[in-house]
Amino acid sequence: MRRTIIAIVCCLTTAMATAQKISREYNNVSISEALRQLNEKYDEYTINFMYNELEDFRVTTKIRNKSIPEAIQQMIGFYPIHMTVEDYEITVECPQKCTQRYKGTIVDEHNQPVPYANIALLSTNDSMLIAGGVSNEGGLFVIPCEQNPVIARVSYVGYKTIMKLCNSTKMGTIRLVPENHMLKGVVVKGAPQYKMTMGGMEIAVENTILAKLGSAIDVLAQLPRVSVENNVITVFGKGSPLIYINNKPMQSSEELKQLKSDDIKTIEVITSPGAEYNAEVEAVIRIKTKKRQATGLSIRNDAYAGYNNWWNAYEELMLKYQTKKFEIINDAYVYTGAWGEDNNLEFDIHAKGNEIDVKQRIPIKGRSNSFSEYLASDYWINDSNSIGASYQMNCSFDNYSTGWARQEIKKNGMMEGTVNATNDVNPKYEQHALNTYYQGKIGKMGIDLNGTYFYGTNERKDLNIETSNELGDRTVHSNSKETSHLYAAKLILDYPVLGGKMKLGTELTKTKSHGVFINEEGFVSSSETDIKEHNIAGFVQYELSLNNWMMGAGVRYEDVTREYYLYGKKQDDVCRKYHNIFPNLSLAWSKGDWSWQLSMNEKMHRPNYRSLRNYMQYDNRYMYEGGNPKLQPEKVYNIETGATYRWLSAAVGYTYTKDAMLWVKYLMENQEVTYTTNLNFDHYQSVYATISISPRFKVYRPTLEINYDRQKFDAKEYGVDKNLNKPTLGARLNNKFVFSPSLMAGLIIKGRTRGYNGFVVGRPQVSVDASVRKSFDKDRWVITLKANDIFKTAREQWTMYGIGAEATKDCYNYNRSISLLLTYNFNSTRNKYKGTGAGNEERRRL
């Protein structure tokens, strides 16, 4: 009897579980009819809807083992239909209550339905976007829109874009035509699209292979001119960019790991930023994400493990809750990892008629541990106005490194002695950032207001112990601590003027930086400095589009006051006042697949606060490094032109830098000791060019980028007997293999010839990386396996030619590694937070 009861209970349980899942097939059935059938057949949920409202929306799909809400969501697809579930009641409605709807079907050259094609309805007066939609699995689309007539623009990757004047809402069947190109007998189909924009280039990510690469940082590594090395991002010819995600400035490269590639719509790489950006900014990357319809709770969890002779790992958990009006985000990240360096150093000193040669081998091993917390919330007042605030904290804990060195010193060719040394370093940092914003409209005027407060500390304790029978023993204790405060506000107003858009605004920053450096033994000078800086900026930028042309011009004025204090006493000789005007001009043209752009601007690079401090760091008895309070900012004048055609892009530019800041080594007065710091030099010039090719061959999707750079800097004028004005060639081949939407692989080969940058000459280098990405359950689970520097060829190798001294470094940083990243996504949505922050470039200087 007992067994019978258990069997009955098991059968009932199985039956109940089975009843919660459905499998059905629909072929050109209206959603109204499909919902009616579900309502009649299943009593688990009550489905509320208006039959006439949803009758125009038709569905063709196969549903397998889904719950009723999941089945309805699959039927809805990209239709402008909203579903809410409360307890056991489901409400399905179309929020756009229009009297007319544009309907049609998208098919390919074989009359097969084309899912996920983009349909945009444009105004017949000015081609402005009115409404849009996406075709479903059956190629069907329905777009509510009151305006008539309209221009329909239908686009899909690998097919020609269709423009169609629609006088009727019944658009019928639209047949797409493939875009085929012959390249040496091989058929090449559509690829990531490049388009020149005002001051830069826009790259489409949505519906391209880039959307399947994993994270935003993986996408950036594939873009023309953008380089990613150890999570450090640079733009060729421009240096480190400011990065914005939906108008919010990136605070850490970890944000790029958190952003999924398939959430990205477009990425704009701006190489000639307008007047609204700080005068120090030479490059900007703006990432725009797709609109996501999911609301409620969403979760993303990343678990990473890597091995490069030591284990390192991180865990990240991001929780978000979204409604139509409100969003709150909490993102916690923790990292732990060991690292190492195998250094071989050699430096020559030419002092007082003596030639001193020092050879040093110094292996280093260290550990880094860090934690970050990000909390943000915003509220959408209406479609045009929103407010929000965010808080971010980053800190390190239990970080250390230890180096073991052996030096061999020769003087005038004779052995002087040997030194055995250990160097223990304990660094520590902590950062807090608070941002608030309002973004909205009053009439036709757009408003973007941001306020930022930043607090940070950076500490370091060094212990050097040197033993030498010939030269004597030394013990050197060094302690340093920097504390920084930043207050900033930024206001941008935009308004339509004479057919274009005018932006004007102001940015205010106030910075306090306090630094202390102590050397107990007095081998180098101790110091206590305070730097106070105020920057008041005003700017105006105007942009105008005329047919195929776009024009932009702007000017930014900055009034900067810097006060410098040493042990509390103001040092008038290194205090500075700057009053500068920075103009910019851009001209762009676009027609069909062709686009072209020309830009000119003036920028200024200000030294970071550490470079301005009056401190010396003890490296060994022959090498010190540190700051320079007399360092002046450098002015940068740039002109650049570029063009794109489909999957081909090219650019060439020229840069002239006045009062160039260069990292250089020179002899300290009356000593056989070198000091490495930044110094100003009269001018520095460079010419650069780049070309990128991204065709598509079925499964194989390569991207080839070739870069050319040549500096013009008279190093011989400063005592260097080498010609450093030689060209550098670099190349990167990104090989991508798309076996299916859920399985991809990549092989990256990159390298360069001998590189010249100021006084530094880098040796040729090449490296090979590989990766495999596999997703499951519609990207809910993603596994990424990577192998970096497979052949162990990536090394840090360079020679610095200085003033009375040279140094050569050959270092292996244990770049060869293998890693595994496991990602889980639940109801993943994009962030709505729109704050752009203020004083972003000033934070980078801190």
Describe the predicted segments one by one:
Residues L35-Y42, N52, Y79, V85, ...:
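Short, acidic, small-residue-rich periplasmic hinge/interaction motif at the N-terminus
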Residues D530-E533, D573-R576, M604-K658, T674-V687, ...:
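Outer-membrane beta-barrel signature, preferentially recognizing the C-terminal barrel domain
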Residues S370-F397, T422-Y567, W589-S590, W594-S595, ...:
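Face-selective signature of the C-terminal outer-membrane beta-barrel domain
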Residues V142-P144, A216, Q222-P224, K248-G274, ...:
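Short acidic/polar hinge/loop motifs at secondary-structure boundaries
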Residues N125-L140:
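Short, acidic Ser/Thr/Gly-rich low-complexity loop/linker segments typical of extracellular
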Residues I90-P95, T169-V177, G185, A216-V219, ...:
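N-terminal periplasmic accessory domains that precede
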Residues A17-C98, S127-A131, A191-T197, N230-L242:
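N-terminal export/assembly leaders
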